[in-house]
Amino acid sequence: MLATRRSFFARAAAIATAQGLVLKGQQTTAPAAPVTHAPGKQYDPRMGTSNAEKYFKYYDRRSKVSLIKGDNRRKNIYDALVAIDDQIRPALKAKKYVFVKLNGVEAAGRLLGSTQPDALAGILDYLAPRFKGPVFVGDSGDGPGNKAVSQFGWDKVFADYKSLKLKFEITNEDQSHYGLLYGIDYDLHVIPIRLGGRFVDPDAFLISAGVLKTHNMVVATMAVKNLVMGAPLAPALGNSNYADSEKRKFHVGIRSGNYNMFLAAQKMLPINWGIGVVDGYEGMEGNGPMSGTPVGHRIALASTDFLAVDRVGLECMGIDASWPGYLNYAYQAGLGQYDLKKIDVVGAKIAEVQKKYRLHADVDRMLEWRGPMLDLPSNLGRNRRREDQDISAYA
């Protein structure tokens, strides 16, 4: 029987109450404590081992995130990168080319929520005296998107950086070069997902030019998601059917979607992720990532630890860090530092710049990944209690 709207929200509220969540548009900022099981307490064996917490490979090193506040977007970005220059240079020297992943092709020409020309200029200002090129600049799309370079004004920036041998490209249109990821669909069946070649090329140094904004599926999006969701291959040229896009395989339900994003980050990050840059000069709140409203925040963040820069970004937005599933999975797998106590923030203090971002109207649904799956199958196998049956006839 189909659930009514009233029953749906009643169930969502019950899940939220059980987890101690606050779903009132504004939320607390402290991360929720990990779910643990008290010694001797009964728990559903379908939930797996009760001592899983101690086996997660949490990142044990300190990370550095620059947080700059100022009235010039370009300078904010540049200063954020200079502040972590000592961490960038060693990795940058080892790579053959840089790829700056912008954010904007799918924003239908709306500058809010997209990588601004001044943000790109700030990144190139930093690179110009430190890297001789080539530098590829671009975004991904679900079809031909070269018009984006002029649509968003990125092409006007290129003329000032001829030494970098700049080239714009749509990164996920090349059907002949890709990396293969095995994710899961809505029914938890394994599915192959093709990721664009640039995103799995060990010769590349990837810079994520993300934007501080809320999201309609994963609560918030910044540096990590900009690369993860830029990687899936688009349909072949001439095919405008979104169903044939690899990106669709990440939009397969709130649980599978978060998990597939984590899997993609786990595959790509060790290969070539260089710097996570987040432009928060004008953030987006409400129904992001494309239909939200502006927040005059006037900040920029950067780090070589993508998880850490997103963690600080969440704090600046006043969002509970335990809410984005893909980031929490990445932390549990040791992909970066997510513990604020182990992140050194240089520049402005978080408390000085923090704002409360209004979240997407569907945030209560997004948080259902945290609750129990209500359609779990019957217990089978080793976790099931042995039945008192006479099986001697089968011996």
Enumerate the predicted regions with their spans.
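N-terminal and secondary-structure boundary signal
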Residues: 2-395
